[in-house]
């Protein structure tokens, strides 16, 4: 089996710098598993890695799609597998880095999403329903047939909502049940799945600090520019953390003070959900920052584990 390294963890835990040091140490290249950093023009609110921070390490799936282009887990899996093949062809090690757990799982377990690309009459019916009665009505239908999928799929992601309803209609089985069964798949890779974590108080302090820095760096201007370019708040990209809150502020729905409070609160909730996801995953290696005196010592531990697992020589 071919090697694959995963480095994940909650937002603002400090994955970026460690991932660069890791890539340099093991002759690796990085595939971003971040559902937001894939979009161009959305830099500040996504805490996107800068070319300077990359330090010459090749990155995939950063700045590859426009904000109004569809990007989802199926597309991520296809793009990531293509990137993995390219990295292997160079004799290097692919490192998946990011906090979108479902994306990581899709590649690691080679999940079959049973995409049916041919249009069906039922799909057309659902698309018409979305146009006439709106995304929320469609999402309510999903809640009735598959509440677990409804929890995972944003109401504005109409295509995924339709696919989930359609899957239930065609098979009589919730797509969430199918995806859960796929979690038990054997991975086609020789892998190590690292989860970087920190004490909750420190993590939440880092989140608050990051939000303040984003605002100082011009997050409001960034969202205003996107709005002026015609990127509507109904887009999946514009529902990302930082963007939906600032968009609401620009629409006069809340004060800047309220917006900052909501953004910090929502980001903390997001970090909590990420950790819940990673705790459910199999074979993860937890790296708690409180157990190490520096990132260098964490890196040493990671390289040691990768050597023991014969992922690197």
From Swiss-Prot:
Residues 34-37 are annotated as: Interaction with substrate tRNA. Transmembrane segments: none annotated. It catalyses: adenosine(37) in tRNA + dimethylallyl diphosphate = N(6)-dimethylallyladenosine(37) in tRNA + diphosphate. Pfam families: IPPT. It is an enzyme of class 2 (transferase). ATP binds at residues 9-16. Disulfide bonds: none annotated. Keywords: ATP-binding, Magnesium, Nucleotide-binding, Transferase, tRNA processing. One of its GO terms (biological process) is tRNA modification. The record marks 100, 123 as: Interaction with substrate tRNA. Its EC number is 2.5.1.75. Belongs to the IPP transferase family. Catalyzes the transfer of a dimethylallyl group onto the adenine at position 37 in tRNAs that read codons beginning with uridine, leading to the formation of N6-(dimethylallyl)adenosine (i(6)A). This is tRNA dimethylallyltransferase. The lineage of its organism: Bacteria, Bacillati, Bacillota, Clostridia, Lachnospirales. The gene is miaA.
